[in-house]
């Protein structure tokens, strides 16, 4: 491993010990904000520090095995050769692990997220599929013990949703779900299809990180147009008699957010503002990323939200992830929320791409 990397790891080890000492300091414990920040830093350092300690131990084992191999005793020599192989293999694996742990972290990975699912081409079938996708993500969230809160729905005439927006809260939510942004295509025989023909429909999924209040960009109230209206259910029928639903338009960007799933106008307004902040932040982030990456686009990009990223083929029980050429024949389990079989390879591909970029640099 490069000396510069070893020095960086030694610095992190030193910082970890400093943070640990500070966490037991009475003054820090009394300052809850500082205590929380240091606790978060300690948990972020934990993995890399523990892996580096294992790496140091493996290097010691290697040196010890080398010394034993100089012995005259044939049995000791044989044992030392075996220990040398084990240590060498451990060092190689731990080096790879440390490289990944040292990759630049997306600052939003630990944030909660908003997930927006919209029916595209395919009419009723697209809306039904949007409902299926929402159920899939809900099941996945439950399996991770995350909280899911519906913020706005526009139901389809024959089931599912023309649009559904939800907030998912929990540990590392955005980091897991961010690569779900893009076009999702379904191929299946609709229940109303008497000839048994396969129809193709599509939905768009957008995943945005929640912007913590302390980091939220300031939104000028003069830039907002706020409309109130009655919340409605499927087919447009009104489900309450007060104007509790909220529509907020951000005039400079043209972004429009509606929230109608809460009974009070105050709650709908608060939720609409948090979604609006996330969308405006996403626009700003996209501008910055485009400027930074004008010469190079990430392989597992979630930038082009219209790009088809995945196909769900029901007759074949197949799910195909187009960005990494991965095809799995376990669609039933996938639609029940067992999606780590695609989520994890996407994260790994992104890490490999970042490592390659560092190598090029």
Swiss-Prot record:
The modification N5-methylglutamine is found at residue 237. It is found in: Cytoplasm. One of its GO terms (cellular component) is cytoplasm. PROSITE patterns: RF_PROK_I. Pfam families: PCRF, RF-1. Peptide chain release factor 1 directs the termination of translation in response to the peptide chain termination codons UAG and UAA. This is Peptide chain release factor 1. It comes from Shewanella pealeana (strain ATCC 700345 / ANG-SQ1). The lineage of its organism: Bacteria, Pseudomonadati, Pseudomonadota, Gammaproteobacteria, Alteromonadales. The gene is prfA.
């Amino acid at each position: 491993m490069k000396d510069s990397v070893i020095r960086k790891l030694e610095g992190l080890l030193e910082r970890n010990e400093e943070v640990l000492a500070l966490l037991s300091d009475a003054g820090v414990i009394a300052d809850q904000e500082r205590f929380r920040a240091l606790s978060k830093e300690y948990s972020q350092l934990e993995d890399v520090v523990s892996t580096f300690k294992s790496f140091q131990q493996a290097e010691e084992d290697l040196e010890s095995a080398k010394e034993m191999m100089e012995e005259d005793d044939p049995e000791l020599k044989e044992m030392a050769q075996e220990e040398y192989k084990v240590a060498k293999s451990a060092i190689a694996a731990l080096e790879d692990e440390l490289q990944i742990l040292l990759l630049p972290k997306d600052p939003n990975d630990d944030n909660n997220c908003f997930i927006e699912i919209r029916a595209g081409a395919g009419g009723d079938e697209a809306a039904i599929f949007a409902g299926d996708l929402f159920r899939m993500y809900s099941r996945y969230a439950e399996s991770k013990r995350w909280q899911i809160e519906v913020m706005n729905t526009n139901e389809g005439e024959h089931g599912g949703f023309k649009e559904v927006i939800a907030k998912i809260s929990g540990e590392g939510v955005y980091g897991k779900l961010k690569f779900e942004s893009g076009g999702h295509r379904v191929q299946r025989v609709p229940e109303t299809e008497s000839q048994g023909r396969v129809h193709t429909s599509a939905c768009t999924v957008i995943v945005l990180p929640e912007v913590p209040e302390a980091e939220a960009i300031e939104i000028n109230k003069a830039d907002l147009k706020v409309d109130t209206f009655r919340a409605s259910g499927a087919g447009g029928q009104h489900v309450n008699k007060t104007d509790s639903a909220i529509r907020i338009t951000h005039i400079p960007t043209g972004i429009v957010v509606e929230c109608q799933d809460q009974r009070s106008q105050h709650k709908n307004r608060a939720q609409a503002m948090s979604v609006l902040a996330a969308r405006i932040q996403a626009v700003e982030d996209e501008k910055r990323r485009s400027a930074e990456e004008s010469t190079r686009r990430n392989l597992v990009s979630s930038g082009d939200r219209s790009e088809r990223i995945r196909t769900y083929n029901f007759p074949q029980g197949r799910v195909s992830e187009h960005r990494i050429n991965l095809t799995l024949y376990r669609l039933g389990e996938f639609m029940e929320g067992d999606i780590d079989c695609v989520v994890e390879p996407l994260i790994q591909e992104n890490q490999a791409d970042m490592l390659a970029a560092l190598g090029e640099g």
